[in-house]
């Protein structure tokens, strides 16, 4: 299995740090509004990478954070006359709902930046101790960028070229030593959330959050760090500088980045009126269509979103789902008998489609070619199944198809709705977990219910739930 490593600018054979295990960190959204379709691309792409790794037998520890303290969240809270915590909590719930509708699996861990402040203070203290950071007179802590000799290795930028492009960055009133130094900790402002620290009451900079959460949940060294290509510089470059200076080892072996999503060949922006949330797309299409559309191009290729392309994705998905429904229908009335000689030959032939699928995915997760292999399997199925097919033959083809679709996150059979009693039992377990302050288990149960389309609402009277 080969993947393209942004760090080396070439495809490399994937060799995990520990045999059979993958430690993967994906930068998650800043939760101040409903997620937009640009946010959805990395969610779907790297969920599919994870699914294929699991298909290949790897145990994947998948961590994806929520940035729940940020200028945009604070601005939204001020506009609404509420707290930053209330805004982020609400939109985390909404984000998880959208993720479930796109069939994005919950991460092994979804850490929140605000729950990891102590770790951030510890890492900043270590960087100061090692001479990689310094506190200014006003309590702001900066990273001493030039001290990290490998700065620019991910974005392939020369630090002197960066300096030339940032001559005006050191504005009046800033107390940093160098124009390229970036913020690790910033002093509080009136009305903003803040935490006590050795330098001042304040809050962390954005970059330190991911370095700390990755270290806590995955360790000093990880296999894969991923996100959108807009994060390569400065966010991921700064993460490397922080983590490698603090921990003394290479931060991530492989770096993966997805390309941008454009709308009708234009960059998505609110000012152009071509800005769409996942929720808005969900009003017109099943979000399985959005997922299928996102996987119809290679993740490193720019993807153009348009009504025509979404209709094409809808039609393509329907071809697959219809073939699956046809097999299920035939299987209900099929004769229970041994495979015929012809059926055995056909099943042997059908393995070529799985091989083609795996070859595509082994080549830097080429989902476009993998989908092509699924379509070939669908055509093969439509040609060779009939009312005379044996149950064993139909089951084998269905299982093959489902196995490939599961990797892509394409649902070809709707799960039966959970019974009310099952839901109530899980809610009771969640309440008990919260009483015991086992918030991780409580969040896991909320995620399980979200995946099943059950939305919880905590009220003074207790927990209310409804089906999505």
Model regions: which residues?
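Alpha-helical recognition segments enriched in aromatics with Gly/Pro capping
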Residues: 1-32, 47, 119-328
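Structural preference for alpha-helix termini/caps and helix-kink/transition segments
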Residues: 267, 274-468
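Short, glycine/charge-rich beta-strand/loop segments that flank catalytic centers
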Residues: 66-70, 92-95, 105-120, 138-147
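Short Gly/Ser/Thr- and Asp/Glu-enriched loop/turn motifs at secondary-structure junctions
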Residues: 106, 136-138, 458-462
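N-terminal, positively charged nucleic-acid-binding surface of large information/translation enzymes
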Residues: 8-13, 17-105, 461-465
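Short phosphate-binding/catalytic loops that engage adenosine nucleotides
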Residues: 58, 132, 454
């Amino acid at each position: 299995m080969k993947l393209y490593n942004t760090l080396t600018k070439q495809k490399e054979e994937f060799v995990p740090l520990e045999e059979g295990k993958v430690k993967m960190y994906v930068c998650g959204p800043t939760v101040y509004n409903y997620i937009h379709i640009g946010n959805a691309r990395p969610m779907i792409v790297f969920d599919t990478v994870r699914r294929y790794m699991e298909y290949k037998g790897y145990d994947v520890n998948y961590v994806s954070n929520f940035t729940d303290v940020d200028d945009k969240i604070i601005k939204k809270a001020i506009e609404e006359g509420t707290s930053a915590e209330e805004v982020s909590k609400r939109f985390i719930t909404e984000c998880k709902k959208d993720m479930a509708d796109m069939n994005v699996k919950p991460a092994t861990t979804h850490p929140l930046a605000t729950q990891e402040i102590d770790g951030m203070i510890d890492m900043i203290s270590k960087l100061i101790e090692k001479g990689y950071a310094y506190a200014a007179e006003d309590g702001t802590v900066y990273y001493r960028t030039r001290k990290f000799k490998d700065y620019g290795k991910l974005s392939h930028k020369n630090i002197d070229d960066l300096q030339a492009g940032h001559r005006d960055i050191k504005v009046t009133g800033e107390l940093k030593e160098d124009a390229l130094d970036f913020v690790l900790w910033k002093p509080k402002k009136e009305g903003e959330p803040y935490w006590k620290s050795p330098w001042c009451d304040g809050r962390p900079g954005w970059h330190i959050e991911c370095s700390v959460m990755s270290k806590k949940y995955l360790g000093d060294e990880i296999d894969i760090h991923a996100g959108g290509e807009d994060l390569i510089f400065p966010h991921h470059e700064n993460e490397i500088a922080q983590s490698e200076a603090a921990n003394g080892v290479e931060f991530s072996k492989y770096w993966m980045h997805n390309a941008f999503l454009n709308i009708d060949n234009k960059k998505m922006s609110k000012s152009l009126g071509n800005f769409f949330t996942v929720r808005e797309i969900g009003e017109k299409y099943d979000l399985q269509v959005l997922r299928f559309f996102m996987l119809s191009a290679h993740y490193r290729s720019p993807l153009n979103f348009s009504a025509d392309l979404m209709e094409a994705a809808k039609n393509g998905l329907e071809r697959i789902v219809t073939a699956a429904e046809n097999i299920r229908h035939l299987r209900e009335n099929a004769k229970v008998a041994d495979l015929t000689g012809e059926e055995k030959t056909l099943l042997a032939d059908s393995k070529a489609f799985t091989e083609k699928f795996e070859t595509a995915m082994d080549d830097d997760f080429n989902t476009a070619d993998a989908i092509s292999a699924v379509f070939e399997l669908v055509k093969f199925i439509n040609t060779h199944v009939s009312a005379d097919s044996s149950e064993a033959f139909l089951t084998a083809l269905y299982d093959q198809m489902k196995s490939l679709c599961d990797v892509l996150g394409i649902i070809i059979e709707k799960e039966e709705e959970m019974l009310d009693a099952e839901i109530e039992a899980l809610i009771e377990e969640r309440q008990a977990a919260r009483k015991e302050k086992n918030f991780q288990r409580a969040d896991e149960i909320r995620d399980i219910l979200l995946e099943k389309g059950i939305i919880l609402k905590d009220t003074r009277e207790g927990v209310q739930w409804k089906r999505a």
